[in-house]
């Protein structure tokens, strides 16, 4: 590794848990993740990737896009936290490009602000024409014009590029001053970005969305005035007709965008991993239908089948996930109507399980009081899906389930970062794209933990 890479890697110190505790919950929760089991088809095709192109644009974009919200990490040399494993990031990016992936999506706020730098280091080692890079204006906390312009220029610097292929107004959907008007229209930032697009430093300008229908309709209606080049939405077979919280069903979002002939970038095809870490009988149902394919491949085939989808983002922290997704899209086998109906039935089955709609995005972090919010919610959801949520001491597997939940909780989340330490300040709530009442959920989980400890269920 050269000097530049060593310097950056040493600088990638982050607060303990921001990058790894969510992964720890998956590794040391109630039981190993089912979908990581060896699949029947282990061949990873080369030169078979499905690409999408939407004239008049010339871009030939891989259907599999690389989401850079999460990164592999290593313990920091000084023991104070964790560092991005830049060598592993480079290896994953090299492998992705070798197998046809050419779209890389990042943002200034990802990985505690280090994702753009890490992504830039990995991509700089490849010819510029080999990849498209997407990043965002994540001006959630400060909508000042100068702050936004500085964020944009910093993105160019960190990514080590002269232009950005796909630039997004990040996470539209909140009403009022935190919405489109307050963050981009009233302060002149959208005018600035339009000029950057005209100058060629932004090749395609669009926005990503989480939020209420009125804000979506408002932003989409501005297409005639501003000409959005693409729009990024949450789309998966669960949210297609059963979106939770304030989110809108993906079939509505997609159909409205398609009416205007705008390409769609898909995020959350796995709902933050919840569509691969599923209850045992649903896992069996999917595997019986297609023994050779992974459970995740069902979700990716669903997300990639709509014809207006440009690319489907996946945060592939591990090589096995990258390889599995490459297999799914090399080439894509679109879902039949019968298979779509099968997945709708599967989505309805999953609604019976009271999981918290957390996608492990970590926008709620860091908590000012050190609570590992995503680690807690990921562990809780995992135990719900795997049947380790006893409702009564009379349950047949009460002792086993109680032990699995409590032991897994302590392994996944350090005691000082558990839900019992939440004071309910609510600073996390405005940042959650799923509109979860986070303190309420943490207090509910803490009460349940205490009932398990005291055996008072």
Which residue stretches match the model-derived regions?
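Structured C-terminal cap/extension of enzyme domains
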Residues: 27, 54, 227, 252-457
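N-terminal binding-site loop/beta-alpha segment at the start of enzyme catalytic domains
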Residues: 2-131, 192
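Conserved beta-strand positions
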Residues: 66, 106, 135, 166-169, ...
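Conserved, mostly hydrophobic/aromatic
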Residues: 54, 66, 104, 119, ...
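Glycine/proline-rich, positively charged
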Residues: 75, 142-265, 270, 278, ...
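Short catalytic-loop micro-motif centered on adjacent basic/acidic residues
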Residues: 103-110, 203-208, 311-313, 432
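Short, well-ordered alpha-helical microsegments
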Residues: 115-119, 213-217, 322
